[in-house]
Amino acid sequence: MFLVSTRNFPPEIGGMQNLMEGLSNALLNHGPVKIFAENIEHAEVYDQNSSLNIERISGFKIFRKYRKANLVKEFINSNEVRASFFDHWKSIEKIGEETLAKTKSFCLIHSKEINHPVGSSLNKRVL
């Protein structure tokens, strides 16, 4: 089983959304895929027409971040996850090293996320 935790997923439109959907569909060729994504307008219609197992997380942004992290941790701890994929360092930062050590974890870095000065608060959060 594979896990995908993303802040960017259809029906929202964009390059990262297309990448995460394509990755998820490609992973289906190798086993079941569980996706944790943020709830957006028209997501229910998309999810019903998709062959992917998508769990949407709603609520205020600050609470949603912790709720999704807790759901991902619980899922990894209670399932045999072959690999987990995260679309952004913010999707992985609250998971915890102990949980991440239970599976192969991949975090996609995009945009301007890797050029923070060494020792800065953003640099420490990314690492």
Task: For each feature predicted by the language model, list its residue ranges.
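Conserved acidic residues
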Residues: R82
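Short, well-structured alpha-helical segments in soluble
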Residues: A69-N79
